[in-house]
Regions:
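Periplasmic c-type cytochrome electron-transfer domains
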Residues: 1-253
């Protein structure tokens, strides 16, 4: 549950340490073209290599130590070797990545609507869907996961970071942190919108505490709607609530 996130501004790691950035949802991560906000991992197995030895997240000293611990667990090793030739960093992270591929949440109300059930959405949600398209939100939030297919600049139609009113952090660099290309400064992997009603707070910096706040900010900074109306925000928010899917046959909540 919880939409595949911890619902914290930044995640809590080992010994209560706080991470530097809002954690993306694990649900439907298999559909992302890269992993992490800055795209530093090419796929799920690559992503799984980072947290175990990160001093803030899990704090293991090395992958040699991690492998040795798993080797000591005879029951685990017996079962693991039924699928893999040996216990290594590569096989462990591959296994984690394969598990994450099962964390898919189909059968949202919007899915049913697209399949022809025109009763699946309320009138307000249909209005919100039309506004979503009108403001070209679907240009970036596209594909199976309605996002996760590109890097985009945060603040196309205004200085988001100046208006935020807090000092810049390393996390604000986005893709630039990996490429050092000035073009990539403040560019981030577009997040999925599936289950977005359950994944507050929003954005890499968790600056939007509620979904309606995120909608307002996106309209202002990404769609050039300087003063979005309350009705439009409410309609789009209602539409986004229709994107909550099911996991193991049960609706997420």
């Amino acid at each position: 549950d919880k939409g595949g996130v911890d619902r914290l501004d930044t995640s809590t790691g080992i010994d209560g340490k706080k991470g530097p950035i809002n954690a993306p949802t694990v649900f439907n991560a298999a559909f992302n073209f890269v992993q992490f906000w800055d795209g530093r991992a090419a796929d799920l197995a690559d992503q799984a290599k980072g947290p175990p030895t990160n001093p803030v997240e899990m704090g293991s000293h090395s992958w040699d130590d991690i492998v040795a611990r798993f080797e000591m667990d005879e029951e685990f090793k017996k079962e693991f070797l039924k699928e893999y030739p040996q216990v290594t960093k590569e096989t462990l992270t591959h296994a984690i990545g394969e598990y994450e591929k099962t964390l898919i949440t189909p059968n949202s109300d919007f899915d049913r609507y697209l399949k022809g059930d025109k009763t699946a959405l309320t009138e307000q949600q249909v209005r919100g869907y039309e506004l979503f398209k009108q403001h070209k939100c679907d240009t970036c939030h596209t594909g199976v996961a309605m996002g996760g297919q590109s890097y985009e600049y945060m603040g196309l139609y205004g200085d988001y970071f100046k208006d935020r009113g807090t000092p810049l952090t390393d996390a604000d660099e986005g893709r630039f942190a990996q490429t050092k290309d000035p073009f990539d400064m403040h560019r981030f992997k577009v997040p999925t919108l599936r289950n977005v009603a359950l994944t507050a707070p929003y954005f890499h910096d968790a600056s939007a505490k509620e979904l309606k706040d995120a909608v307002s900010a996106m309209l202002k900074y990404q769609s050039n709607v300087k003063q979005p109306t309350q009705k439009d925000v409410e309609d789009i928010t209602s539409f986004l609530e229709s994107l909550t899917g099911e996991f193991k046959g049960e609706k997420l909540k």
